[in-house]
């Protein structure tokens, strides 16, 4: 069974910096402002010769349970319960505070092994804080600097001593099976063979995106059947993208909760800019993006811009009309919403849109059925023979226009990518091919090969002319 380590402590002591150091990637947002981390984040780590799962947590604060800070503390308590070992982090520069004393008592009650980590120990100013740390009653402090990578060998030894060698090394696995290295912003898979088989054993990467306060985290909690993510009436509760593994009808799913995207003109603070960057990274890494609309106020300008962003990134967009439990005259409203989808989002004909209620768990199976269906289409490979028989038919029915008195010729088509489907068309004078004709071909491909709701990429190439460059006789 995998070793799980939780990083806990009061706000702004460097927990997320240590988390990033352990996983070897800048996954967690880091800022000088306290309280950046809110949800608990779990990731596989390789720390020297140790392999384990590490949990980043929100800073522990004194607050009532019903407040945002109180709900954040509840998430941290869950992480403590899930962990085999606790890294209790303090700021050696600022010394011990009353909050450190109170929360040290909290983690002691868990009866879990604890390693006391005196972070920010790179300067002489931290010397007194390291000595003060003994007063917490958590044993000898391990002095490190997560930012500068100092003292990490001592931390490794402290972890092994705390859990024992058997537990520390029991779950050691090959690096390539523990550390997942996927290319963020993948532009698709090049096709070299005719028959690309759809792999149902591979996980589907799904990002949940949308404006702030549309119910994204509530929807994921409902999908999981547990309060995994922090939710609340406050807008902008989620700050960074959280990855969660899930299984639906025996299909492995990797979910990404993301921070709400506001209009660019409203984004002023550095922290929100970091959150937006993290959300965009999650969208590019995902395969399917569920854009959550508030059914009581759908199709705001920002909703449409987010869908357009997903399409431009080549990901599969699916609209989730959330808070459907608040809607009356459901059938009439749904028909109107589908009509608006077709009118306001013509970039992808046949865009999937599903009404649901994240709060009550209604419509989730319908959403997932649409996701698995359209994900298969996104991976579809069409043979060159079928494509060219189709091309001959549509060009005969509607030939390309004449430009400057010379008719354009479309000669050949082949699929060069999946994820999203990408096609190369050989034609004369591609630089003057009208966008209207390309839309005609793109929509024709969707209709003929049953690819509704999926972005399609068309690229044009000049057909080779064997006489170009030949010497005149």
From Swiss-Prot:
Keyword Membrane attributed: no
Keywords: GTP-binding, Nucleotide-binding, Repeat, Ribosome biogenesis
Domain EngA-type G: 3-167, 204-379
Residues binding GTP 1: 9-16, 56-60, 119-122
Annotated residues for binding of GTP 2: 210-217, 257-261, 322-325
Family: Belongs to the TRAFAC class TrmE-Era-EngA-EngB-Septin-like GTPase superfamily. EngA (Der) GTPase family.
Protein name: GTPase Der
Gene: der
